[in-house]
A protein has these predicted regions:
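Glycine-rich ThDP/TPP pyrophosphate-binding loop and its adjacent helix/strand module
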Residues: 27, 31-227, 427-523
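Thiamine diphosphate
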Residues: 1-73, 225-456, 461-463
Length: 523
C-alpha cells in the first residue's frame, strides 16, 4: 500500500530509505504526521478531530449524514501517555466532546528502562474517564494468566467506540511487547533495539515458521491482506456517490472546498486590511494585530484561532464569532458552537495548543493561529519545531515580547527566546516595529503556505511611523524580512556612504530612529 515495497521494509532505519525509524510527513506516502517526540501524535489526533468538526461546519453544517463525517484513530504507547502534552490534549478532547476520536493505548507496561511500574503508577483508564472520555479495557493478557491476541474483542471495542458520538473514546489494550519472542518478550531491550538474528530465528520456531527464511510471506496471508483493497474500493465508491450528491446541492460549498484544498485565499481578501495613521504615541503591536486578525476573518472564513487562556492579553479573539466548543460549555463570557465556532480556548496548555494546531493544519485547508506570551513559547517549542519540520502554515501570536510587559518581572521577560526561536530551521520569526508593519507581516504570513510563522508583539505602545513621509519607507519590503526604514540625510540625496548602520526590530526600532536623529544632529 501507498507505494511501499518489501524492499522498503528491508531498508528500515537505513539512510535514504522510505522507512525511517520515526515516520516522517511528506517523506513516506500515507504518513499523516511526523510524531517522533512522544505525545505529539495524541495532540495531533485531537487537532485532526477538531478540524474535522470545523470543516463540517464550514461545508455542510448540521447533524445529518454527511460526506465530511469521518473518524480519527490514534495509537499511543506508554511513553506517549507519560508525556505531559498527551494529558493536556486529552483534557481538551474531553472538554470538546470529540466523538469522532478514538485513542488506542498499547499498554505493554515496558519502556527503554524496563517495567514502567518504576515510573508510571496511576490507573490510566481512570484518568481518561476523569477527562470525560468513554473508556474500555481489552486485556489480551487475561490478567497475566494467558496471552491471547483476541482480535474480535478489539474489534468489538472499536465498534462500541465508533457508536459513542458524544465523547472521545479510549481503549486500553493490554499487550505483551515482543510476544512470542522467547527471551525478549516483556523486556526493555525489545523496546529499544532489534531482536537480533538468534532471537528472530527462535521466534519463528515458536510460530511454526522456517527460521532459515527471511521476509517470507505465506500466500494465504498475502491473499487475505489484499482483500483490503477491494473493501477500500467499495467504500470509496460509496463515498464518491455521497460526495457527488452534496456537490450538486452545494456549488458554493464545493467552490470553497476547492479553494481550501489548494490553500488559496479568496479574491480581494487583503483589500480591507487596516492602515494606520502616523502617531508618535502610537499603539501596541498586539492591538494592531487584533485589528488585522478581525479584518482577515471578515473575508477568510477558514481563519480561526485563540489563546492559551490569554485572549485578553494576546488580543487574539475574532469578534462576534462564537467559541469552538459544545454549546453546553458556554459561559457568561463566551457563547459556544461546536461547528461554527472560530474562537479556540486551549486553556493554560501551551504545548497541547502547538500540537493541536499542527493536527488542525494537517487535516485540511483551514488557517489557525494560537497565542501566548513570548516567554511561554518554551512550553510549546517541540510542537513549533515539528511544524517547521513538516512545513505547516501555523501562526503563533507571541505577545509581551520585551521587558516592557508590566509588573510580572523576570519570569515573564523574554531574553533568549527570539534567538532560540530564530535558530529553528524553517520557522519565520517576525517582530514588527509599528502597526503598519503588523499589517504587512500578517499579509506575508497568510500568503505563505509552506512554513510556520511567529509574531513577536509588544504590550506597550510604540510609535506609528509616517510611512512614505519624512524619509520613512513604506512597508512594501517587509516581506523580505529586513529593509531600510530610514536612510541618513546624505544618502537620501543619493550620495555618500553611511558611517554606521543601526539595526533593530520591534520596540527597539524607535530607539534606532531616535539614535539616528541624535547622530545626524551631531554631524
Amino acid at each position: 500500500g501507498f507505494g511501499l515495497e518489501l524492499d522498503d521494509l528491508k531498508a528500515l532505519r537505513t539512510w535514504g530509505s522510505k522507512t525511517p525509524g520515526h515516520p516522517e510527513y511528506r517523506h513516506t506516502a500515507g504518513v499523516e504526521t511526523t510524531t517522533g517526540p512522544l505525545g505529539q501524535g495524541v495532540g495531533n489526533a485531537v487537532g485532526l478531530a477538531m478540524a474535522g468538526r470545523r470543516l463540517r461546519g464550514l461545508l455542510d453544517p448540521g447533524t445529518h449524514a454527511s460526506p465530511f463525517d469521518h473518524h480519527v484513530y490514534a495509537i499511543a504507547s506508554d511513553g506517549d501517555i507519560e508525556e505531559g502534552v498527551s494529558g493536556e490534549a486529552s483534557s481538551i478532547a474531553g472538554t470538546q466532546n470529540l466523538g469522532n476520536l478514538t485513542l488506542i493505548y498499547d499498554a505493554n507496561r515496558i519502556s527503554i528502562e524496563g517495567n514502567t511500574d518504576i515510573a508510571l503508577s496511576e490507573d490510566v483508564a481512570a484518568r481518561y474517564a476523569a477527562y470525560g472520555w468513554h473508556v474500555q479495557v481489552v486485556d489480551w493478557t487475561n490478567g497475566g494468566k494467558e496471552y491471547k491476541e483476541d482480535v474480535q474483542a478489539l474489534h468489538k471495542a472499536l465498534e462500541a467506540a465508533r457508536a459513542e458520538t458524544d465523547r472521545p473514546s479510549f481503549i486500553e489494550l493490554r499487550t505483551i511487547i515482543a510476544w512470542p519472542a522467547p527471551n525478549a518478550q516483556n523486556t526493555g531491550k525489545a523496546h529499544g533495539s532489534a531482536l537480533g538474528e538468534e532471537e528472530v530465528a527462535a521466534t519463528k520456531e515458536v510460530l511454526g515458521f522456517d527460521p532459515q527464511q527471511t521476509f517470507e510471506i505465506p500466500p494465504g496471508v498475502l491473499e487475505h491482506t489484499r482483500r483490503l483493497s477491494e473493501r477500500g474500493a467499495a467504500a470509496g465508491t460509496a463515498w464518491d456517490e455521497q460526495f457527488q450528491k452534496w456537490r450538486d446541492k452545494n456549488p458554493d460549498g464545493f467552490a470553497l472546498l476547492q479553494r481550501l484544498n489548494a490553500r488559496q485565499l479568496p479574491d480581494g481578501w487583503a483589500d480591507k486590511l487596516p492602515t494606520f495613521d502616523a502617531d508618535p504615541k502610537g499603539m501596541a503591536t498586539r492591538k494592531a494585530s487584533s485589528k488585522v486578525i478581525n479584518a482577515i476573518a471578515a473575508t477568510v472564513p477558514e481563519l480561526w484561532g485563540g489563546s492559551a487562556d490569554l485572549a485578553e492579553s494576546n488580543n487574539t479573539t475574532i469578534e462576534d464569532a462564537p467559541s469552538f466548543a459544545p454549546r453546553e460549555r458556554s459561559t457568561d463570557e463566551w457563547s459556544a458552537d461546536p461547528q461554527a465556532g472560530r474562537v479556540l480556548h486551549f486553556g493554560i496548555r501551551e504545548h497541547a495548543m502547538g500540537s493541536i494546531m499542527n493536527g488542525i493544519t494537517l487535516h485540511s485547508g483551514t488557517r489557525v493561529f494560537g497565542g501566548t506570551f513570548l516567554t511561554f513559547s518554551d512550553y510549546m517549542r517541540p510542537a513549533v519545531r515539528l511544524a517547521a519540520l513538516m512545513g505547516l502554515p501555523v501562526t503563533y501570536v507571541w505577545t509581551h515580547d520585551s521587558i516592557g510587559l508590566g509588573e510580572d518581572g523576570p519570569t515573564h521577560q523574554p531574553i533568549e527566546h527570539l534567538a532560540a526561536l530564530r535558530a529553528i530551521p524553517g520557522l519565520d520569526v517576525v517582530r514588527p516595529a509599528d502597526a503598519n508593519e503588523v499589517t504587512a507581516c500578517w499579509r506575508a504570513i497568510m500568503e505563505h503556505t509552506d512554513r510556520p510563522a511567529g509574531l513577536a508583539l509588544t504590550r506597550q505602545n510604540v510609535p506609528v511611523f509616517p510611512r512614505g513621509e519624512e524619509g520613512f519607507a513604506d512597508t512594501t519590503d517587509v516581506h523580505r524580512g529586513g529593509y531600510v526604514l530610514l536612510d541618513a540625510p546624505d544618502l537620501e540625496q543619493g550620495g555618500g556612504q553611511p558611517d554606521v548602520i543601526l539595526i533593530g526590530t520591534g520596540s527597539e526600532v524607535q530607539l534606532a530612529v531616535e539614535a539616528r536623529r541624535i547622530l545626524a544632529d551631531d554631524g
